[in-house]
Amino acid sequence: MTTIITVRKGGKVVMAGDGQVSLGQTVMKGNARKVRRIGKGEVIAGFAGATADAFTLLERLEKKLEQYPGQLMRAAVELAKDWRTDKYLRNLEAMMLVADKSITLAITGNGDVLEPEHGTTAIGSGGNFAFAAARALMDTDKSAEEIARRALEIAADICVYTNHNIVVESLDVEG
């Protein structure tokens, strides 16, 4: 699996993810890019789970963003509706974090669209470790990027399905 984290602090929203792709007990690739910009560069998306499934969902989200430009929440809800009701999509095994300048959302395969509190959230095999680390660092003077990187490093030290090859994307937030 993998670990993806997002941190919103100090005028920035940062998303970071590791690069490990595992097949069972084997590391197949160490430098996959699971965090990327979509929606004309206005949205950051990160995924955990089956890679092909995640790409399918990213493509669907991009289409929803074209349909509802500048409305990340609406696009995410419409994607979640499709994900939950479509016979093919319902079987996809992936989760996504998405963020734009004003909102961060976690989109699950159950059709949930969740807006995290406390300025941070994480998904994937090391998500709970990264989330706990980020929560502990939110009250420090560290920047959003420093928190995201350190939280992922801690998760990678603990979770065998997360590595230290970290990719970071960031956006300036409204404020």
UniProtKB/Swiss-Prot annotation:
InterPro entries associated with the record: ATP-dep_Prtase_HsIV_su (IPR022281), Ntn_hydrolases_N (IPR029055), Proteasome_sua/b (IPR001353), Proteasome_suB-type (IPR023333)
Sequence positions that bind Na(+): A156, C159, T162
Enzyme class (EC, first level): hydrolase
Residues annotated as signal peptide: none
GO biological process: proteolysis involved in protein catabolic process
Location of the protein in the cell: Cytoplasm
Single GO MF descriptor: threonine-type endopeptidase activity
Gene Ontology CC: one annotated term: HslUV protease complex
Claim: Protease is one of the keywords in the record: yes
PROSITE patterns reported in the protein's UniProt record: PROTEASOME_BETA_2
Regulation (activators, inhibitors): Allosterically activated by HslU binding.
EC number: 3.4.25.2
Domain of life: Bacteria
Location of the active site: T2
Subunit structure: A double ring-shaped homohexamer of HslV is capped on each side by a ring-shaped HslU homohexamer. The assembly of the HslU/HslV complex is dependent on binding of ATP.
Function: Protease subunit of a proteasome-like degradation complex believed to be a general protein degrading machinery.
Family of this protein: Belongs to the peptidase T1B family. HslV subfamily.
Protein name, entry field: ATP-dependent protease subunit HslV
